[in-house]
Amino acid sequence: MISAKTLRPAIAAIALFAIGATGAWAQDKITVTSEKPVAAADVPADAVVVGIEKMKYLTPEVTIKAGETVYWVNGEVMPHNVAFKKGIVGEDAFRGEMMTKDQAYAITFNEAGSYDYFCTPHPFMRGKVIVE
């Protein structure tokens, strides 16, 4: 049987790894315009969509033109969001609101660049938007 004394350091190590992993997603500059979550049914038919299911972004990398909008659509009961970091420790971090099942979140990318993102409560969920 595993004792609490043995388990606590392991949990602490996992937590520190997760925190460190999110710091690796530092951004030099992000210029986005966001909306609050909307019903997935309201996402335009011709939109660039990243689905979320089974604890992952289904299209982990998308390429768009500056000024275009990406919609993240949550298809599962587990709440998710989209977050970007501007600094290693999270200064000026952008974190979208949590989406529940059948909700979508839209972000407009106004400047060219490569934008790595992750889900705040699930930092192993990662993706990238490349803006040309």
From Swiss-Prot:
Residues 27-132 form the Plastocyanin-like domain. The gene is mauC. Pathway: One-carbon metabolism; methylamine degradation. It comes from the Bacteria. It comes from Paracoccus versutus. Residues 1-26 form the signal peptide. The keyword Transport applies. Its cofactor is Cu cation. Cu cation binds at residues 80, 119, 122, 125. PROSITE patterns: COPPER_BLUE. It holds the Pfam family Copper-bind. This is Amicyanin.
